[in-house]
Each structure stands twice: as structure tokens, then as C-alpha cells.
Curated annotation (Swiss-Prot):
The protein's name in its UniProt record: Formin-2
Subunit structure, interactors included: Interacts with SPIRE1. Binds actin. Interacts with CDKN1A.
Biased composition (Pro residues): 893-944, 1037-1097
Null mutant phenotype: No visible phenotype in male mice, but female mice show reduced fertility and produce at most one to three pups per litter. Female mice display defects in asymmetric spindle positioning, asymmetric cell division and polar body extrusion during oocyte meiosis. During early pregnancy, females present normal numbers of implantation sites, but only very few normal-looking embryos. Most of the embryos show developmental delays and gross morphological defects, leading to embryonic death.
Gene label: Fmn2
UniProt note on tissues of expression: Detected in brain and in oocytes (at protein level). Expressed almost exclusively in the developing and mature central nervous system. Detected in oocytes.
Entries under InterPro entries matching the protein: FH2_Formin, FH2_Formin_sf, Formin_Cappuccino_subfam
Sequence repeats: from-to residues: 919-929, 930-940, 941-951, 952-962, 963-973, 974-984, 985-995, 996-1006, 1007-1017, 1018-1028, 1029-1039, 1040-1050
Superkingdom of the organism of origin: Eukaryota
Keywords: Actin-binding, Cell membrane, Coiled coil, Cytoplasm, Cytoplasmic vesicle, Cytoskeleton, Developmental protein, DNA damage, Membrane, Nucleus, Phosphoprotein, Protein transport, Repeat, Stress response, Transport
Modified residues (Phosphoserine): 89, 459, 489, 493
């Protein structure tokens, strides 16, 4: 599709309506379009055909969007104005280009684009997602008129932000490269400028947010509450348009009631970002997500002030379908470019958080989802939105480019609306996913590889889906609830499933292609204070990490781009695109038959944690896997499908505005209280190495400062979608504690900075194309768990893996992420292997959400100490808690105070005790200052995990059972210890290098090579399992809306019975908890995945089918570097953990040589296999073992040599010579007989067991008299000695043979009996043949006639010759020469003539079957010629002699043998000897007679012996006849055949003649007229 799309787009021209042209025409639009790249690409594919402004059906566009997933991540300003919208014409593109170059994602660009946005998506003809402007800036306070561009209404703050973005932004790179062009470098510069601009805009917006909080009234709560960042599509902007999975996530949150298809009852839990309306309004928002991705760096920068006010303002609630769509479109367009989008996202997130608290949260979710979907949708050009009905076309990647193109860049996979489910459930129609996929093209691409539409894709109308999925509540619980509803439908919202076929795919899927200058501009816009050098440095780091790839390289290594390929120096003029770190399609969530899909990163919520219920972002989680949360119940609005048009968009807008205003006010207050946050946000941005900020500037100090401040206004969340087959863990974001001790957690900015540093990999990590999503979440969630809850939580089985863990998360175990929750909920959430008996380690690098992709500048604040949660240090004699020493460098977080023990766990961590049984080495005592000791190693662990080194906020979880060696403690300065290796992992990965906030999660089971350590800046380790839990789930971190549902109080195991094969049933939901825990995995799944912690995103499906691999716990908003390319199937040193337990039969069984199929080893996302459904029935092992055990096979007897005990060489006595001993040894090894068998055969003359050949070999190798003498002598001498040396095997064998009574005599008689009969018979046959030949040659009539003809013709030829003529006979020697006498014409020989003459004149049967050959047969003559009478005589004499010997031997046996051994030997041998004598005498007489006859025959032919011979030998005589007979027979056959043919012809001729005479042919008279002729013809 890639080539086709490109062609279409080119045909459409610069004015391409879908937004590709928009980028080409308008610089700002270019950025927007680039952000909308997924949509743009899609538009290019199909929409490009339509030409700018053409009203292509939204369905068609959605198809193009989904198809464009190949290039969905590319931002191409040069391309069609797809981002602008199908309605946009070339002029529109030009107009957009006329906008300030810097206006990549700025509010100004959005404002300028507003006129376009004023057109509703439907009017423009674009799908909602397509029309939505990704960077549409919507004032929270200002309601967007249906036709008026809401972006214009953006508050001054938004405008300022936009301006900042514009400054950072650039118009098209200036190169006219097509989206599909492999070589376009200008976009890289654009991306960099966009990032810089986003940074500056972020700072400005953050500052303005405080001011604007009071300025803009909060929009009245409506069914759709804006999601933080949704308005701006910041998540998408930061993350880049999400893959369709992101869109799916966004779509899960319906934005507007008017969303026709998607909007069912889904109410976005978070306030919609600019791209939050994924459904009908999604267009704008879809672009926003892409914008978010583009401005990854900006998200890396903290947006402390971009909070509610701007977020809400930036992204007006899609109250009115048209206005919302336009705003969304602008937001998307702007968001992808402008940091404003990012700023808006935090704002929107905050607003959404507020809204989520309100019933408006549902609306926010819808809006957010719309925003998310927008990035993927071909967002219309800056302001022009063509309202196209949402269409979710399903496209199958058919083109080589699509298949090979890299997965959508992270920009394409920005978190869609936190409400949006990133990947629809398999149950969700793939078409809906496709629509989503188009919105989140990057993710979609991988998904598409896995399936037609890709699980991540969502229809533009994600709002409906979101509404259906979940109530508007913005909490993680809400997301869980929504996920339960929507995700239950199949990963995507039910609406998605329903609308999937027709719903337009969000334009989110396009790749962002941008110049380096654009990226720099965005960075500047986000961080005004950051010098350009830092931005360039940051971009270079991103490239080095492989997150940012030259656009030309993105297609060379489609899905497995090696980070090395991206290591080229950063060039402003170079076109860049985000490396799609997507997981293989199978790694995506797999729930209910759906294969796991890469999920886009989630949106952070702009609201403060307190304000916003921490909505959970649904990361392309199967709906079934999504846990319903209380939010779902509270957000009834989400359940309703709102038609924005029918419901009235004004209400939604008002609600959003009110929410935005509230968020602004709250943010302003927080910022005033904690001004340090604002400062550190930019600092973190600039400091990110691979994130949006330079890592140098980012430090844990920022985190610490923010922690001291108490609560970071927002948290940054980074997500990357990776192709890693292992799993895609979701980002685990730990909300800062209400009172973080020692400022453990910094402000979001600081956190983001730190996380960026931590996350920045030491080297390029991206092996696979991945999407990176940055989310800014101003809010933090600080929820204290009740003692009972905590205690019960400790009893909980491991929570199920987040759906987000594509490859590893349990497909059936949903986990919700709320965009607004972002890092908070993500930190709380940790996905454990679905079927793992032990909690999974954190997601591997490359895991979509958990892995922090290099270049992902997203700084995520480290999780606060579990201060709010009374989590006691895990009492473990083997795992004393290490206390953190001062962290090295500003980046190190101070150690959180050790939380008091959980209720019921009153014992504080005891001093190190002796290692438990089976544990090789107890962990060292905790270092002073460590807040929480590492949990003791699980039973069966050889070595307890080393306690975390000083400076680690949370000790690493103990190695899982079966892990031979616990991971080494993190080096000093490492913020968080690496999680223990998962079961089956032989060696844990080395600890992260100093300065790395979070060590890479241990390799999943079966992964031979541990993933590279996470990039610096990742500051939160997975929480340690609570004590007392068989498989302890990670304790809920502070700020988590709802702790993981512990089993009912006092119940060691949760009530629900485990399904067959499920070791531990899922824990029951806590009382009052809105979302029940996911259903236990299907039988055979092993242990159900641990329930998602509140705020955690949906668990990634652990793998295709139910896999035993645990899902890695979410890191706090950081992306791990992608796994090396070769880790999937190849290069794995260790066997993957099998799904089924090892069977140990009681007996060794016969092997069945079949080809094994293991579901977890599958990499592709082919349709579910029958093996996933088939269950093994119980079988009767006992009967089966009896029948098919190896013992049933008859054992082959060992060689007789093995029966003799072998003694040491020095003790063996060798009496035989070496040669003799070797010969006997060979015989022994060849005999598989027992000595008893041999004795039986010899004594009883039974040849059935021991054949004659074996007896002959034994007889020939029997011990000779002298040898036997020696052996007997040694035996006698050794009897008297105790320690006498034993005989060697050959000697022992010969000695045992000699013990058989009369062995030699008996065997000789037996052998002679057999040979005598054969010899006599042979002699008899030969003598009879000679006699027969002699008689034939003497008296045969044929011979006489032939010889007479020869004589006649010879005399005739020799007539007149006195020497030869008139002969009476001739010597036989002439007979062989007759064939050489030729006729005068050489046509025939004399022999052939004689044969012909004989047959025609003498043989009456010539030519008939009865014809008999007149001469002796050549074969008999030949045999006779080989005989000699001397040989006959010799053989007879030998037989006579042997017969006498046999008689003598038999006599000996008669004399010596005992009576028991006498018979049947005596009787048999006597009879044989008597008959043998008779036969031998008769043959002697026959030989004499035959000899006499032969001599007579030779004399008869007058044959004379040669000189020196007494008589003619049979050889001479019969050789002549043999030769003549052979030649004669050949001629005879030919002539006989010829005669036969002649006779046949004669017979036929006779028949003809007879017929001719008998029949009279009368020629009929025919009429000569015309009628007669005609009749004859007819």
C-alpha cells in the first residue's frame, strides 16, 4: 500500500486533501500533517487520490489512514494536505504554508488553521479522525462553534503557546519529498524544531496556565469530559500519533456524541485532548497525538503550567461535532508539531482529571479518545475539517513497502486519549481496529502485520467506543471499568467493534516525517530556556538511540531497524521520522482469541493527581482484559453513546471549559505552591538525552525537588511500542506521595527529566520500529491504601499483566491506563505474566509502554516512596532491605522512608537471617536508608536477590522461582534496582549502569540475552511483591486511585475457583470496587495474571495464547530500550518456558516423533490456533504405560562378550596369541547367543536357534588341544588361589565351549551331515547333465539334420576342390565359423541361410509356438564345458573320507557321552552315515558311466585330444558346441519370427481372396440430377 499511497498522494499533488499536501503546502500543516502522518499517509494512500478538498468518503479515507500505517509515523510537510483535511485544497495547503514557519504545532498555527477547522469533519468530508486537526488548540473555556474553528477561540495562552510552537515550528522542510520518499531529511529538522518549540510552548503554557486558570471558565461538565492533553492531542503529539492501538485506546473514550459510528455510549474518561475525539471528532485529535509524538522532546520537558487551563483551552471539548472536529483537527495538527499540544495535553489531562471527577469525565474520555484517534486520522489541514463519517476500513498490508516499512514511529503512537483503548479486543471488529489503526498508523502497522486492521487501530469515533466502554470517570478505576466494558468487547471499545467495519480509521496512524529543524523548533517551543545546542544534542541522542530515524532509513529496516541505523549525526535539513519500536503483532495484547498487539503509549492526564481520578489509559487491551473500575460505575455518561450533534456540542464544550478552568485554577495553585516544578520541567526537557530533554540537564534533583514540592503538577509518561516478542509492558508510573519524604519524587518536570536520563540508553537500543509516546500528566494520584486493603493486597495473587504488555500480558486480563493517569497509574500498574506463577519482571526494553525507547525524551518522575501506602518492608530473613545511600549526582533520588509494615504484618524487616533451605546465599543486609527491603527470594531460588544499593527507592523484587541467580543489585546511583529475572531466565541481566534510573527488566523466560538497561531517566522500579503473597503482587503505589483488589479479608486465596490448570484464581475485587478482576485465564493457562493495579494500563497479553511468560510490571512512564533484533526466536540461548507442566511417566515411554508446536514461540499474529482451544483430557496412564513403555519392547540380548564379566586389564590372563584372541573376540561380539543355546543346538542337533553357519564359525574357532590345555591348567591353578587372575574374555569363551559335552565331535558330525548331502546332490546333477548332452549330440534328430545341411552346403561350396570337396564329414571346429561366411552381397551369413533353410524345409512347426530348437541348449552346453571329471572324482573321494571321519567322531560321542546327551545324536547320525555311504557309492558309479559316455561321444564326432592330453576334455568339446548352438539359436529366433509374419500375411491374403470371390460389388445407380448431387452431399 505504501507505493500506491505515495502514487495517489503524488497524483493528488501538493493540494492533497488528506494532509500530506497540507504539510507540503503549509509548514505548520506540514508539521501537523507529519504528526498526522498516519492519517496523512492513509489519506495519501486513498485520500491522496481525492485531491485536496475532495469529499472522499470518510470510509475511504479511514481506509487510507489505516493503510497508510506504513508511513503513518512520517511527518511530511511536502505531502498532500491530508492533515488539513480532505476538504483542504491545494490553495489551503498554500495558505497553511503561508503560516509562520515556526508554527509547527503552535497555537498560532492552530488558530490560523482554525478557519479550516471551522469546517466540521463531516463538512470537509473527512472522517472525524481525518478532519480533526491534531494540534487543534481549543480553549477550554471557549466553546467551539460548530462551524467556527475552535482553535481560533483558543485562549491567549493557547495562542502564545502556539506562537512558541510556531517559533519552534517550521513550515515544510522545503524539500518536496513525498511521504513515501525514502530520502527526505528536512523533516528531521522540523521535528527537532518542533520539539524545541514544544519545549518553549510548554514552558509558556505552564506559566500561562496559572494565569489562565482563572481566566477561562471551566466548561460545564458534559457527557464527554475533556481529557488532559486530549485537547491538544498532547499525548499524541508527544507520543506521536499512536498506532491504531493507541487510537483504539483513544477511541475507547468517546469524545463527542456526534461521533456517528464510534460514539455509542463511550464517554471518554479523560477530557479529550485536541485529538481526543477519535471518533467523528477524532480527526483533529488524531493529529494531536501524532503531534504529541512529534514533540516527544516537549513531553520530555515538563509542562507544569500547561495544565488544566491550557489543556482544556487548547483542546476544546468536542461539544459540537463540527467545531470539535475542527478543534480536534487543529489540535492534532498543532499538537503533533507544537509543544502547545503537549502543553495542552497536560492541561487537558488536568482538566480531564477534573472532568473525570465530574460526570463530564465520560465526555473527556470521549474527547480524549477522539484526540487520540485524531493523530492517526488523516487530520485535515490546519483548520479545515471535512466531516466525513467515521469509517474503519480494514486494509491488509499487501505492498512490500507496507510490510517492510518500519512500524509507526513513536510519534505515530502517542498515547491516544487515555480513554482510548489502544488495541481493540479481538472481539472488536478488525475494521474498527483498522479505523483505529489508521488513527494510530504506527502501531497499526505492526498490528496490521499481525492482522488486517491491527489490534491497535481504532475508528475515528473512539468517543463512542469510549463511551460504551467506560463511564466518563477519569480514574484508573474508571479506565479499568471502561476497559472492562469496552475492552471486553475485544480490546477495542464495543463501539469500535461495532463501527470498526465502517468507522473511519483515525488518521493517527501516519508516520511523522519531519525535518530536524522542525524537531528543534518543537524543542525550542517546549523549552524556551533551552539553548539550541541542547536541543540538537538531544536530537542526536534520540537518533543514536534509534528512536529518531532518517526518513530514508525508516523503510530500509521496516520493523527491525537497528539503533545503529539511526546513529547518523543529527541534521536539521534531514527528514526524520520516529522509529517505530513496535512489537511483533503477536506480541500485542492477545485476549479472547485476539493476538496481542503493540499498543501505543498512553496519554497523561493533565489534571493533578488529586483533581483527576487518574483515569486509566486503555492500551490496546482486549476489552475482556480490561478491568472495570469504580470509575466506570461513576461515569455513567461514558456508558451512553453520545451523538455530539444530537446531544448538543455546546454542552460538552461548556463542561470542558469548566473543567479546564478548574484544572487551570488547580494547576495555578499547585504551581504557586511548587514553583520549582515549572523550573525543573524545562530543565528536564532540555536534559533529556533520548527523551525530549537533554539528559545532562535532567537530574534526579529535579525529581527530588518536585518530590519536596510535594506533588508534581503533572507527570510525564513515555511509552514505546516495541516489536519485542517477549511482551510490551505498560509504563508503570508511580504517583508522588502526598508528602514525599526527602522529596523523593520530583516534580513531573524533574521526574520527566530524571526519567529521560534514566531512560536514555547507553547506546542505540531500538532494534525494532517502535512508537514512542510522551505523556504529560500534571495530576498525580495519591491514594492511601487502607491497612486492610494493603494487607489483603499482600495476599493477592500476582495482578494480571497489563493489556499493554502486548506480547506478555494476559490477553484476557485487561488493564486500563488512563492517559491522564499517565505515569501515576502506570507506575502503580505493573503487569505480571498472565500464566506465571510468579510476578513478572518489569517489561523488557522495547516493551511498548514499559520500555523506554531511546530518544524518547519523556521525563517521568520517579515513583514516590510508598509513603502513602503502609507497605511494610517485606520481612524476609533472606532479603533485608538495603537502604539508599545518597544517590550519586542530582539524578539520584533520596531513599524514601521505610513504610511501616502492613497491618497484620506487624513485623518490620528482620535482620538478615540464615538463608532459607535451598537458598544458596542470603541477601546482604539492607543498606541504611533503604525505604523498602527487597522481598525475600521465592522458594526454590538458589540465591536471594541482592538488596538494592543505596539510592534505590524500592528494592528489586526477589528473583522469581526457578531463577538460578538473582539479578545483581543496581550499581550505586541507580535509582531503581532491576527486577529479578523471570522464571526460566538463566542469568539475570546485569544491573543498570550508574545514573540509570531504572534497570532494564530481566529477560523474559526463554530470552537468552537480557534486554539492554533502560535509558537513564527511568526512575521507578517495579514495586516489590507484598509479603505473605504466594506470588506477591506489587504493592499499590501512592496516588493509585484504587489498590489492587486483594482477596477477601482472611482468605488466603481469592474466592473465585481457579479454572482447571490455574494455580491461583484471580483475586476478587475489593468491596465497592467498580471493576471486577479479570476472569481467570482459561484452563491450562497456569496462574492467572495478577490483577492490574489501579491506574495501570491494560496488561499486555503475555503472548499468543496463554503464555507462562509473566508480563513485566510497568515502569513508571519510561520506555525501555527495544530488545535486540535477534532476541525473538533466534539467538535465544535458553528454552522458553513451556505452557504446560513437565510430565514424568513412571516408566520410560516409547518416543513419538512429532513436530512440537508451542504457542508462546509464535511470533506472527496469525489467527488463533486450534491448539489454544484444545484441552488435554485425562488419560489412563497405567494402561498406557503398560502398552507403550519401552519395557514392552523385547530386549535384545547382549553380545556374548558382555555376559562374561570383564576384569581389569592388569588382572586378566591372556593365554592366546594376539591374533587368535582378536579372532575369538570378534566371534564373541558377533554372537548374540547364550552358551545354553549353543549347547542345546549341539546336543539336540537343533538348528532353529543356532544356524549351521554359526556352528561352523564356532567349530573353526574352537579351542585347539594345546590352547585348551593351557586354559585348563590355569583354571586348575587358579582354584587354589584366592586372588588368582582371571582369564581374558576369549579364553573364557573357549573354555566355556569346551565344557559342552563332545562339542568338537558333535559339531563336526552335524556340519558334515549338512555338507555331505549338498555335495552329493551337486555331483549327481552335473553327471546327469553330461549324460543328457552326450545323448543329444549323438542321437538328436535336429542335430543330425543341421549337421547334414552344413555338410551339404559345405560340399556344394567346396565342389571341385580336391582337398575339401566331396567330404563325408567335417571337424566340429568349423561350426562356430559358419556365421563368419558371408554372402556375395554381404546381406546374410551362411549360418543364417542354413537356419532359414532348415526351418523352411525341415521343420514343419517353423513359425509356430510348437517349434523346437533342434540343438542342445547353449546354457547346458556352457555348464558342461566347465566340468572336469577329475573334479568329480576328487569330490567323491573327499566325501568318502569325511564320511569315514564322521563315523569315527560319532563313535567317540557314543562312547563318551552320557545317556542323557546320547540321543537324538546317536540315532540321527547312524541313519545319516548309512545313507551317506550308499549315496557316495552310487555317485562313484555314475561318474564312471558318464565319463565313458562322454568319451564315446567325442569319438563319435571324431574329436581327437590335443597334444599332451590323454583324452578330449569336456571343456573343448562342449565349448565348440556351445558357441555354434548360441549363434544358431539367435538366427533361428529371427528366422522363426520372420516366417511367422509371412504366414500371417499369407493367411490374410487368403482371406481377402476368399472374400473377393464370394462378394459381388454392385455399384448403385445414382441420379445425375442436381437433387441427387445435393442429397449425396448432405
Amino acid at each position: 500500500m505504501g507505493n500506491q499511497d505515495g502514487k495517489l498522494k503524488r497524483s493528488a499533488g501538493d493540494a492533497s486533501h488528506e494532509g500530506g499536501g497540507a504539510e507540503d503546502a503549509a509548514g505548520p500543516r506540514d508539521a501537523e500533517i507529519t504528526k498526522k502522518a498516519s492519517g496523512s499517509k492513509k489519506a495519501l494512500g486513498k485520500h491522496g487520490k481525492g485531491g485536496g478538498g475532495s469529499g472522499e468518503t470518510s470510509k475511504k479515507k479511514s481506509k487510507s489512514d489505516s493503510r497508510a500505517s506504513v508511513f503513518s509515523n512520517l511527518r511530511i510537510r511536502k505531502n498532500l494536505t491530508k492533515g488539513k483535511g480532505a476538504c483542504d485544497s491545494r490553495e489551503d495547503v498554500l495558505d497553511s504554508q503561508a503560516l509562520p514557519i515556526g508554527e509547527l504545532d503552535s497555537a498560532h498555527s492552530i488558530v490560523t488553521k482554525t478557519p479550516d477547522l471551522s469546517l466540521s469533519a463531516e463538512e470537509t468530508g473527512l472522517s472525524d479522525t481525518e478532519c480533526a486537526d491534531p494540534f487543534e488548540v481549543i480553549h477550554p473555556g471557549a466553546s467551539r462553534p460548530a462551524e467556527a474553528g475552535v482553535g481560533i477561540q483558543a485562549t491567549a495562552e493557547d495562542l502564545e503557546t502556539a506562537a512558541g510552537a510556531q517559533d519552534g515550528q517550521r513550515t515544510s522542510s522545503g524539500s518536496d519529498t513525498d511521504i513515501y520518499s525514502f530520502h527526505s531529511a528536512t523533516e528531521q529538522e522540523d521535528l527537532l524544531s518542533d520539539i524545541q518549540q514544544a519545549i518553549r510552548l510548554q514552558q509558556q503554557q505552564q506559566q500561562k496556565l496559572l494565569l489562565q486558570d482563572s481566566e477561562e471558565p471551566a466548561a460545564p461538565p458534559t457527557a464527554i469530559s475533556p481529557q488532559p492533553g486530549a485537547f491538544l492531542g498532547l499525548d499524541q503529539f508527544l507520543l506521536g500519533p499512536r498506532s491504531e492501538a493507541e487510537k483504539d485506546t483513544v477511541q475507547a473514550l468517546p469524545v463527542r456524541p456526534d461521533l456517528p459510528e464510534t460514539t455509542k455510549s463511550l464517554v471518554p474518561e479523560h477530557p479529550p485532548s485536541s485529538g481526543s475525539h477519535l471518533t467523528s471528532e477524532t480527526p483533529g485529535y488524531a493529529t494531536a497525538p501524532s503531534a504529541v509524538t512529534d514533540s516527544l522532546s516537549s513531553p520530555a520537558f515538563t509542562f507544569p503550567e500547561a495544565g488544566p487551563g491550557e489543556g482544556a483551552a487548547g483542546v476544546p471539548v468536542a461539544g459540537t461535532g463540527d467545531t470539535d472536529e475542527e478543534c480536534e483537527e487543529d489540535a492534532f495538527e498543532d499538537a503533533p508539531r507544537g509543544s502547545p499540544g503537549e502543553e495542552w495535553v497536560p492541561e487537558v489531562e488536568e482538566a480531564s482529571q477534573r472532568l473525570e471527577k465530574e460526570p463530564e469525565e465520560g465526555m473527556r474520555e470521549s474527547i480524549t479518545s477522539a484526540v487520540v484517534s485524531l493523530p492517526g486520522s488523516p487530520a485535515p489541514s490546519p483548520r479545515c475539517f471535512k466531516p466525513y463519517p467515521l469509517i474503519t476500513p480494514c486494509y491488509i498490508k499487501t505492498t512490500t513497502r507496507q510490510l517492510s516499512s518500519p512500524n509507526h514511529s513513536p510519534s505515530q503512537s502517542p498515547n491516544q486519549s487515555p480513554r482510548i483503548k489502544k488495541r481493540p479486543d479481538p472481539s472488536v471488529s478488525r475494521s474498527s481496529r483498522t479505523a483505529l489503526a489508521s488513527a494510530a498508523a504506527p502501531a497499526k502497522k505492526h498490528r496490521l502485520e499481525g492482522g488486517l486492521t491491527g489490534g491497535l487501530s481504532r475508528s475515528a469515533d473512539w468517543t463512542e467506543e469510549l463511551g460504551v466502554r467506560t463511564p466518563g470517570a477519569g480514574g484508573s478505576v474508571h479506565l479499568l471499568g471502561r476497559g472492562a466494558t469496552a475492552d471486553d468487547s475485544g480490546g477495542g471499545s464495543p463501539v469500535l467493534a461495532a463501527k470498526a467495519p465502517g468507522a473511519p480509521a483515525t488518521a493517527d496512524g501516519f508516520q511523522n516525517v519531519f525535518t530536524g529543524r522542525t524537531l528543534l523548533e518543537k524543542l525550542f517551543s517546549q523549552q524556551e530556556n533551552g539553548p539550541p545546542e541542547e536541543a540538537e544534542k538531544f536530537c542526536s541522542r534520540i537518533i543514536a538511540m534509534g528512536l529518531l530515524l532518517p526518513f530514508s532509513d525508516c523503510f530500509r529496516e521496516p520493523c527491525n531497524q537497528n539503533a545503529g541505523s539511526s546513529s547518523a549525526p543529527f541534521d536539521q535539513d534531514q527528514l526524520y521520522t520516529w522509529a517505530a519500536v513496535s512489537q511483533p503483532t503477536h506480541s500485542m495484547d492477545y485476549s479472547e482469541g485476539q493476538f496481542p498487539r503493540r499498543e501505543p503509549s498512553m496519554w497523561p492526564s493533565s489534571k493533578l493527581p488529586e483533581e483527576e481520578p487518574s483515569p486509566k489509559d486503555v492500551d490496546t487491551e482486549p476489552k475482556s482484559s480490561i478491568l472495570e473500575s469504580p470509575k466506570k460505575c461513576s461515569n455513567g455518561v461514558q456508558q451512553e453513546v453520545f451523538d455530539v450533534k444530537s446531544e448538543g456540542q455546546a454542552t460538552v464544550i461548556q463542561q470542558l471549559e469548566q473543567t479546564i478552568e478548574d484544572l487551570r485554577t488547580k494547576i495555578a495553585e499547585l504551581e504557586k505552591q511548587y514553583p520549582a516544578l515549572d523550573l525543573e520541567g524545562p530543565r528536564g526537557l532540555s536534559g533529556l538525552e533520548n527523551g525530549l530533554t537533554a539528559s545532562a540537564d535532567v537530574s534526579l534533583d529535579a525529581l527530588v525537588l518536585h518530590g519536596k514540592v510535594a506533588q508534581p503538577p503533572r507527570t510525564l509518561e513515555a511509552k514505546s511500542i516495541q516489536t519485542s516478542p517477549t511482551e510490551e509492558g505498560r509504563i508503570l508510573t508511580l504517583p508522588p506521595p502526598k508528602a514525599p519524604p526527602e522529596g523523593l519524587l520530583g516534580s513531573p518536570a524533574a521526574a520527566s527529566g530524571e526519567s529521560a536520563l534514566l531512560t536514555s540508553p547507553s547506546g542505540p537500543q531500538t532494534k525494532f520500529c517502535s512508537e514512542i509516546s510522551l505523556i504529560v500528566s500534571p495530576r498525580r494520584i495519591s491514594v492511601q491504601l487502607d491497612a486492610q486493603q494493603i494487607q489483603s493486597a499482600s495476599q493477592l495473587p500476582p495482578p494480571p499483566p497489563l493489556l499493554g504488555s502486548d506480547s506478555q500480558g494476559q490477553p484476557s486480563q485487561p488493564s486500563l491506563h488512563t492517559e491522564s493517569e499517565t505515569s501515576h497509574e502506570h507506575s502503580v500498574s505493573s503487569s505480571f505474566g498472565n500464566n506465571c506463577n510468579v510476578p513478572p519482571a518489569p517489561p523488557l526494553p522495547c516493551t511498548e509502554s514499559s520500555s523506554f525507547m531511546p530518544g524518547l525524551g519523556m521525563a517521568i518522575p520517579p515513583p514516590p516512596c510508598l509513603s502513602d501506602i503502609t507497605v511494610p518492608a517485606l520481612p524476609s530473613p533472606t532479603a533485608p532491605a538495603l537502604q539508599f545511600s545518597n544517590l550519586q549526582g542530582p539524578e539520584m533520588l533520596p531513599a524514601p522512608p521505610q513504610p511501616p509494615p502492613l497491618p497484620g504484618l506487624g513485623v518490620p524487616p528482620p535482620p538478615p537471617a540464615p538463608p532459607l533451605p535451598g537458598m544458596g546465599i542470603p541477601p546482604p543486609p539492607p543498606l541504611p536508608g533503604m525505604g523498602i527491603p527487597p522481598p525475600p527470594p521465592l522458594p526454590g531460588m538458589g540465591i536471594s536477590p541482592l538488596p538494592p544499593l543505596p539510592g534505590m527507592g524500592i528494592p528489586p523484587p526477589p528473583p522469581l522461582p526457578g531463577v538460578g541467580i538473582p539479578p545483581p543489585p543496581p550499581l550505586p546511583g541507580v535509582g531503581i534496582p532491576p527486577p529479578p529475572p523471570l522464571p526460566g531466565v538463566g542469568i539475570p541481566p546485569p544491573p543498570p549502569l550508574p545514573g540509570v534510573g531504572i534497570p532494564p527488566p530481566p529477560p523474559l523466560p526463554g530470552v537468552g540475552i537480557p534486554p539492554p538497561p533502560p535509558l537513564p531517566g527511568v526512575g521507578i522500579p517495579p514495586p516489590p511483591p507484598l509479603p505473605g503473597v504466594g506470588i506477591p503482587p506489587p504493592p499499590p503505589l501512592p496516588g493509585v486511585g484504587i489498590p489492587p483488589p486483594p482477596p477477601l479479608p482472611g482468605s488466603g486465596i481469592p474466592p473465585p475457583p481457579a479454572l482447571p490448570g490455574v494455580a491461583i484464581p484471580p483475586p476478587p475485587p475489593l468491596p465497592g470496587m467498580g471493576v471486577p478482576p479479570p476472569a481467570p485465564p482459561p484452563p491450562g493457562a497456569g496462574i492467572p495474571p495478577p490483577p492490574l493495579l489501579p491506574g495501570s494500563g491494560p496488561p499486555h497479553s503475555s503472548q499468543v495464547g496463554s503464555s507462562t511468560l509473566p508480563a513485566a510490571p510497568q515502569g513508571c512512564g519510561f520506555l525501555f530500550p527495544p530488545l535486540p533484533t535477534g532476541l525473538f526466536g533466534l539467538g535465544m540461548n535458553q528454552d522458553r518456558v513451556a505452557r504446560k507442566q513437565l510430565i514424568e511417566p513412571c516408566r520410560p515411554m516409547k518416543p513419538l516423533y512429532w513436530t512440537r508446536i508451542q504457542l508462546h514461540s509464535k511470533r506472527d499474529s496469525s489467527p488463533s490456533l486450534i491448539w489454544e482451544k484444545i484441552e488435554e483430557p485425562s488419560i489412563d496412564c497405567h494402561e498406557f504405560e503398560e502398552l507403550f513403555s519401552k519395557t514392552a519392547v523385547k530386549e535384545r540380548k547382549k553380545p556374548i562378550s558382555d555376559t562374561i564379566s570383564k576384569t581389569k586389564a592388569k588382572q586378566v590372563v591372556k593365554l592366546l596369541s594376539n591374533k587368535r584372541s582378536q579372532a575369538v573376540g570378534i566371534l564373541m561380539s558377533s554372537l548374540h547367543l547364550d552358551m545354553k543355546d549353543i549347547q542345546h543346538a549341539v546336543v539336540n542337533l537343533d538348528n532353529s536357534v543356532v544356524d549351521l553357519e554359526t556352528l561352523q564359525a564356532l567349530y573353526e574357532n574352537r579351542a585347539q588341544s594345546d590352547e585348551l590345555e593351557k586354559i585348563e591348567k590355569h583354571s586348575r591353578s587358579s582354584k587354589d588361589k584366592e586372588n588368582a587372575k582371571s582369564l581374558d574374555k576369549p579364553e573364557q569363551f573357549l573354555y566355556e565351549l569346551s565344557l559342552i559335552p563332545n562339542f568338537s565331535e558333535r559339531v563336526f558330525c552335524i556340519l558334515f551331515q549338512s555338507t555331505f548331502s549338498e555335495s552329493i546332490c551337486s555331483i549327481r546333477r552335473k553327471l546327469e547333465l553330461l549324460q543328457k548332452l552326450c545323448e543329444t549330440l549323438k542321437n538328436g534328430p535336429g542335430v543330425m539334420q543341421v549337421l547334414g545341411l552344413v555338410l551339404a552346403f559345405g560340399n556344394y561350396m567346396n565342389a571341385g576342390n580336391k582337398t575339401r570337396g566331396q567330404a563325408d564329414g567335417f571337424g566340429l571346429d568349423i561350426l562356430p565359423k559358419l556365421k563368419d561366411v558371408k554372402s556375395s552381397d554381404n546381406s546374410r551369413s551362411l549360418l543364417s541361410y542354413i537356419v532359414s533353410y532348415y526351418l523352411r524345409n525341415f521343420d514343419e512347426d517353423a513359425g509356430k509356438e510348437q517349434c523346437v530348437f533342434p540343438l542342445a541348449e547353449p546354457q547346458e552346453l556352457f555348464q558342461a564345458s566347465q566340468m572336469k571329471f577329475e573334479d568329480f572324482q576328487k569330490d567323491l573321494r573327499k566325501l568318502k573320507k569325511d564320511l569315514k571321519a564322521c563315523e569315527a567322531e560319532a563313535g567317540k560321542v557314543y562312547q563318551v557321552s552320557s545317556a542323557e546327551h546320547m540321543q537324538p545324536f546317536k540315532e540321527n547320525m547312524e541313519q545319516f552315515i548309512s545313507q551317506a555311504k550308499i549315496d557316495q557309492e552310487s555317485q562313484e558309479a555314475a561318474l564312471t558311466e558318464t565319463h565313458k559316455c562322454f568319451l564315446e561321444t567325442t569319438a563319435y564326432y571324431f574329436m581327437k585330444p590335443k597334444l599332451g592330453e590323454k583324452e578330449v576334455s569336456p571343456n573343448v568339446f562342449f565349448s565348440v558346441w556351445h558357441e555354434f548352438s548360441s549363434d544358431f539359436k539367435d538366427a533361428w529366433k529371427k528366422e522363426n519370427k520372420l516366417i511367422l509374419q509371412e504366414r500371417v500375411k499369407e493367411a490374410e491374403e487368403v482371406c481377402r481372396q476368399k472374400k473377393g470371390k464370394s462378394l459381388y460389388k454392385v455399384k448403385p445407380r445414382h441420379d445425375s440430377g442436381i437433387k441427387a448431387k445435393i442429397s449425396m452431399k448432405t
